[in-house]
Amino acid sequence: MDIVNIAWAALMVVSTSSLSPVAWGRSGL
């Protein structure tokens, strides 16, 4: 595994986990 790939994967996971509740909240409202 490359450090860059790991960093990108971590960034995607964090952004997804932080944006999902917002998207769900907006669609729910």
UniProtKB/Swiss-Prot annotation:
UniProt keyword Zinc present: no
Species classification: Eukaryota, Viridiplantae, Streptophyta, Embryophyta, Anthocerotophyta
Subcellular location: Plastid, Chloroplast thylakoid membrane
Residues passing through the membrane, by range: 3-23
UniProt-listed GO biological process terms: cytochrome complex assembly; photosynthesis
HAMAP family the record matches: Cytb6_f_PetN
One Pfam family it belongs to: PetN
Single GO MF descriptor: electron transporter, transferring electrons within cytochrome b6/f complex of photosystem II activity
Family: Belongs to the PetN family.
Protein name (database record): Cytochrome b6-f complex subunit 8
Lipid bilayer topology: Single-pass membrane protein
InterPro entries found in the cross-reference section: Cytochr_b6-f_cplx_su8_sf (IPR036143), Cytochrome_b6-f_cplx_su8 (IPR005497)
Subunit-level organization: The 4 large subunits of the cytochrome b6-f complex are cytochrome b6, subunit IV (17 kDa polypeptide, PetD), cytochrome f and the Rieske protein, while the 4 small subunits are PetG, PetL, PetM and PetN. The complex functions as a dimer.
Keyword Electron transport: yes
Keywords: Chloroplast, Electron transport, Membrane, Photosynthesis, Plastid, Thylakoid, Transmembrane, Transmembrane helix, Transport
GO cellular component: chloroplast thylakoid membrane; cytochrome b6f complex
Function text: Component of the cytochrome b6-f complex, which mediates electron transfer between photosystem II (PSII) and photosystem I (PSI), cyclic electron flow around PSI, and state transitions.
Domain of life, source organism: Eukaryota
Entry-linked SUPFAM superfamilies: PetN subunit of the cytochrome b6f complex
Primary location class: plastid
